[in-house]
């Protein structure tokens, strides 16, 4: 049996050094000190020492996890990974996670609901991206689907509009078809389904306005002419056609510009 010959406070508040038989043995938190009533003169068996150290490891894990949770909500996986990075044993981490879950500080279902709610309010991701993000955070599939279940297409459409509204400024600068394509590409890359992306685009960008389309064709046609005017006529026409097609204009619109129906060809240099 070892005897506690000294208990001294560390400079770090709430930590204590335990000396056994005149030699430093280990340090404990105030919580562990109180739990085992560690006082000078107390005898400790090897089993009791192991019990104290085991409890201390769990207490340390709980304290670390609680501090980590104080900044923002976390998932069970995030807390477990954090404790592992701080060299907390798997068993101590598991006990800490179980304790915090029991106390209600760790709740993956509530986390998933809050994550979805925040995305609907200020985020820019569709259901596919939200699902992927939650999965990366270790949320079980059934909890993810439960959190997504009550979100309507109209709510997702609101998120989608927030994501692509900046592209509305390109109307009148490029073809409506190209505005549509850019919007749908961006929506798909942020986890919106094809049907949702199409619905958002149709709602934001109504049928093409003839004057806007003409203005866009003139703007891009002049850009193409200035870029390629140094080429021979045949090559220049081919390159202009490719350029305008890549900006969403139809073959008929491009041909109309190239034959001078939009702007007389002899006047192009004046712009």
UniProtKB/Swiss-Prot annotation:
Disulfide bonds: none annotated. Keywords: Cytoplasm. The keyword Nuclease does not apply. Gene3D superfamilies: Winged helix-like DNA-binding domain superfamily/Winged helix DNA-binding domain (1.10.10.10). One of its GO terms (cellular component) is cytoplasm. Modulates RecA activity. PANTHER family: REGULATORY PROTEIN RECX FAMILY PROTEIN. InterPro entries: RecX_HTH_1st, RecX_HTH_2nd, RecX_HTH_3rd, Regulatory_RecX, WH-like_DNA-bd_sf. It comes from Lactobacillus delbrueckii subsp. bulgaricus (strain ATCC BAA-365 / Lb-18). This is Regulatory protein RecX. Its main location: cytoplasm. Belongs to the RecX family. It is found in: Cytoplasm. One of its GO terms (biological process) is regulation of DNA repair.
